[in-house]
Amino acid sequence: YKRQEIGSAAAMAAPALVHLRGGTPSMMAHACAMAVKNLLGLVCDPVGGLVEVPCVKRNVIGAMDALSAAQMALAGIESRVPPDQVLDAMAEVGRSLPPSLRETGKGGLAATPFGMAYAPKEG
C-alpha cells in the first residue's frame, strides 16, 4: 500500500539505526515493530493530488519515529505485540481503510475546502 510509505520507511530505518549502533537482531525487530505501531493507520490524503501537502511534513514525523523507536530498542524496551503480528496488523489496517483515504486525493485533508481549491504551481 503506497500510503504506507512513511510507516514502511520508518520501519526500515529504525532497525538500520539499531544495527549501526551495535544492537542485536532482536532489538532491530522490536525497533521495527515500535516504529510501525506509532504510525499505524496513517492515511494518505494528498492535497491537490500531490505528495507535497501534507506528506512532506509527515516524512519528518516518520524520521523522528524511526529515531525514537531505535533509541527505545537500544535501551532495552520491547514491543509488547510481537513484531510479526505488528506487520500483519499493518496490512490489515491498510486493507480496512476506505478508498477515499488511499492516495486518491478524495478524503481527509484533500476533502477540506482548501484541499479542494488547492491548485499546485506548475514549475
Residue locations for each model-derived region?
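Conserved small/polar residues in nucleotide/adenosyl-binding loops
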Residues: Y1
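Functionally critical mobile loop/hinge segments
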Residues: I6, A10-G123
